[in-house]
Amino acid sequence: MKNKFLLFIFVAASFFNINFIAHSEESIEDIIKGRKAIFSNNAKLAKRVNILLREFEVEEAEPIIFEMSKNYENLLNYFPENSKEGYGTEALPIIWEEKDAFNALMQKAADDMLQLAKVMEEVDDIQATYKKLMWANCNACHSRYRKPH
């Protein structure tokens, strides 16, 4: 009876361990695919904002800019230690080596988007402001933290 009980415990523990490993792996996949989707979405939104600002459609651009800001803040949660490789990630290892600097850049990007929303109706050269407050952050990230294409 005691041996059967121990066998049951062993089988049950093995089952839960296998499920935990599979779930962890699935979570890594979800994290990497999730961050890729957020970056891809922000790229599409940035292009849309660019068009709207060229046409001086500031009111239409504002909610998109707020969405982009929120996306950058959300990205702070998408780079855990166990998500450095796999699933087509384009993230370079330097992200984890310079985690504080990377997180600061994501926060700066979020803050700069809010700043853009705040000043876009008041500036003389909206395109220059847009490049400074948005594209500069995109370029900083891509040039340091993303695999070249």
What are these regions (language model features)?
Residues S14-I21:
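C-terminal segment of classical bacterial N-terminal signal peptides
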Residues L7, I21-S27:
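N-terminal leader/targeting peptides and immediately adjacent processing regions
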Residues V11:
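Active-site-proximal loop/hinge segments that shape catalytic or ion-binding/gating pockets
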Residues E26-H149:
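Sequence context surrounding c-type heme c attachment/ligation sites in exported
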Residues M1-F8:
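Bacterial N-terminal signal peptides that target proteins for export
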